[in-house]
Every structure is written in structure tokens, then in C-alpha cells.
């Protein structure tokens, strides 16, 4: 249906990633498929649910994202005369659209919770830190060492030169 992908791409999780890795031209973000999209660490969810297959938590997470993404589209459709710029103006965003996005963010966060993320995030910095850890896990041949880099850096800085 495409609603799953659209939902993840419209989420706070993806927006935080985009703001962290996208280039900029003046104050505008430059969304690059090669840098932003292709390197985005998607949640591990199945492609589709096969007939007569029991629903797993990942299938339920995918269905929740699809449903929430459709709710965002439905909320936008309530304002056919409004442009996206008008709908997403922080001062005048319709409450129904804001609520739909909040539900979408919760559904996406729940999907990431299945792969080690939190169910709620304090801020975008936490989201981005998790996404970079996930990216490292997905692209590394060896498991990521937690905290090792900080300890090594402290140890080298604290050593006296002989």
C-alpha cells in the first residue's frame, strides 16, 4: 500500500535523522536519496503478512504504522483548500492533523522499540543517537562495542608520555 513507508518517512524518527545527516543550502535541508534515505535504519518489519500466518509483534507494528499513516492522509483531506505549507505551519496546524501525527510517531516508536529502541524519547538527540547505533549495527560485520570508544579516548588522554 505504501502507507507503511510514507508513515515512517513522515515520523519524528525519520525527520530527526534527516536533520542530522542531510546537507543544507542556506537554511533549507537538501534531502539526498543516497545519504538520507538509503542510509536510514528502518525498523526490521516483514514485507507482508502471508495468508494464515499468525500475526507477530512486528506485523502488528507495521499494521499500526499503516493505519496511523492513513489517519494523517485523512486529516489532511479534511482541508482540501489548504496547501501543505498552510497545514504544517506550527502556529496554525489543525488539531486533527497534529493528533494524527502524534499517533503516527507513537506507532513508529513502538516499531523501533521491538529492535531495542525506547517507547518514548525525550528529544531528537536521543532518537538520532539510537539511529546511529542502529545504523552501525546494521552495517558492521562485528557487533558494536558499547562504551568502548569513550573509555579508549579517556585512557589515551590520561596517559603520561614516556
Label every model-predicted segment.
Residues 1-162:
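S-adenosyl-L-methionine
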Amino acid at each position: 500500500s505504501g502507507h507503511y513507508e510514507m508513515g515512517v518517512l513522515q515520523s519524528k524518527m525519520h525527520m530527526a535523522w534527516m536533520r542530522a545527516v542531510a546537507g543544507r543550502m542556506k537554511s533549507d535541508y537538501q534531502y539526498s536519496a543516497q545519504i538520507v534515505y538509503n542510509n536510514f535504519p528502518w525498523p526490521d518489519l516483514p514485507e507482508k503478512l502471508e495468508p494464515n500466518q499468525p500475526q507477530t509483534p512486528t506485523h502488528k507494528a507495521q499494521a499500526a504504522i499503516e493505519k496511523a499513516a492513513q489517519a494523517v492522509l485523512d486529516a489532511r483531506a479534511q482541508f482540501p483548500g489548504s496547501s501543505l505549507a498552510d497545514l504544517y505551519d506550527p502556529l496554525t496546524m489543525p488539531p486533527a492533523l497534529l493528533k494524527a501525527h502524534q499517533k503516527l510517531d507513537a506507532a513508529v516508536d513502538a516499531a523501533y522499540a521491538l529492535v531495542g529502541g525506547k517507547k518514548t524519547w525525550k528529544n531528537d538527540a536521543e532518537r538520532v543517537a539510537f539511529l546511529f547505533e542502529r545504523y552501525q549495527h546494521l552495517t558492521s560485520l562485528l557487533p558494536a562495542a558499547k562504551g568502548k570508544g569513550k573509555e579508549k579516548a579517556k585512557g589515551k588522554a590520561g596517559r603520561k608520555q614516556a
